[in-house]
Amino acid sequence: MKNIVPDRPGEDDPGPGRRLGLDVGTVRIGVAVSDPDGILATPVSTVARTTKRRGPDGEDIDSIVQLAHDYSVVEVIVGLPRMLDGSAGSSVKHAQDVGFRIRRRLERDGVDVPIRYVDERMTTVMAQSNLHDAGISVKEGRSVIDQAAAVEILQTWLDQRQRR
């Protein structure tokens, strides 16, 4: 799998429609969705990771593909968890693998939905900070943190898209 460079919002933009945002971790995947106008991101769910890197698609991929169908999304935005210096670690490979699997499954279903990758450095930290400000601890809010990080990823994409 080649190294993926983050995409730029607005390039090959599919136009109006919902977008799905994913914060891919090794244990969970946070999921967010935009409104139909592509302006506001909201949390949807946290999906437990079941797919092994070299194994067949698991229930996590099934769930995300189903959400893409349910919301009739026009793009899927996957966060690339790069290191602070911009280099790619093993977590980037996990995100790429999830994006590849979702794209393959959607194509198999006859749906052409682009997978976009966005630099997500610091989104989890921002999500934790926002939840802390709301009085939710890290321990009690792990799955909420993943959703909040997915919202940060997607909202950043949507905001940059609006500026173009």
Swiss-Prot record:
Localization per Swiss-Prot or TrEMBL: Cytoplasm
Major location (coarse): cytoplasm
Record SUPFAM superfamilies: Ribonuclease H-like (SSF53098)
EC number: 3.1.-.-
Alphabetized UniProt keyword annotations: Cytoplasm, Hydrolase, Nuclease, Ribosome biogenesis
Entry keyword annotation includes Transmembrane helix: no
GO molecular function: nuclease activity
Organism ancestry: Bacteria, Bacillati, Actinomycetota, Actinomycetes, Mycobacteriales
The name this protein goes by in its record: Putative pre-16S rRNA nuclease
A Gene Ontology BP annotation from the UniProt entry: rRNA 5'-end processing
Keyword presence, Cytoplasm: yes
Similarity section: Belongs to the YqgF nuclease family.
Pfam annotation, one family: RuvX
Originating organism: Corynebacterium kroppenstedtii (strain DSM 44385 / JCM 11950 / CIP 105744 / CCUG 35717)
Superkingdom classification of source: Bacteria
Stated role: Could be a nuclease involved in processing of the 5'-end of pre-16S rRNA.
Any one cellular-component term (Gene Ontology): cytosol
